[in-house]
């Protein structure tokens, strides 16, 4: 049993005992929500923590607990097991899961570009593009993660067969930087603020940049909606009012990001997220503001692009009939107050 599952079991048992003793709480059970975030210090997942810092969850009468999890694939496993109610992770997981007969739905879209960059070690100038991935170890947050999906796509698109390079799970932040420094990986996909830290240390330079919509279209052939809040269809069906409250909070957060400067947004965030470099954090946020959706809506051409990308290399998705309309909904965003 994992530490998380053990704590969840203890918490559940405690809840049962309190209920039996006749205790009550101010918030209803439906308004207590646990969400796993695939690394909430990352700028790509900033809206989840920003909503908390701005008081938008409480404003909706919600008691939201955010749990940090480095890799999205582990987060979705916890949700499917019923241990948490939602995941803040990449939209592409909904397509991947449907191909395996599991139905989850993106209810609000945070990013319209991945915010990811393939970084190449300064020790390996021979890697000039994805066509040079062959024979190298490439860093990803986790095997089965969105960074691994994108890495595999870029390789296959550029004529490099799966199996001729190795994806290495190195997480993000300090662990990613250490792997690059120790030459355990020669290139790897990561986000801010890790990108800025690598460049400042002279360890790596950007190879393929997907922090803007235009750059993403050039790399992937279309808009690639990335981080979002997704939940199981079963949970959504049974808790529509709670889901609407959550989406209300996130739509308000997206509008805050759109209407405020990087300095103003950074001032709301925990100082430790800036790993001792607040100036670099603000600079990275300013450069990446375009990746955030202004209103939480799914870009119209996004799902088709993601399906095309996954169909290129994924044995789970390739050849399967995927109903994209069941992988996301705009119902709650359009009704947001």
What are these model-derived regions, one by one?
Residues 236-316:
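Secondary-structure end/capping motifs
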Residues 29-170, 179-192, 203, 207-208, ...:
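Short, glycine-/small- and polar/acidic-enriched structural segments
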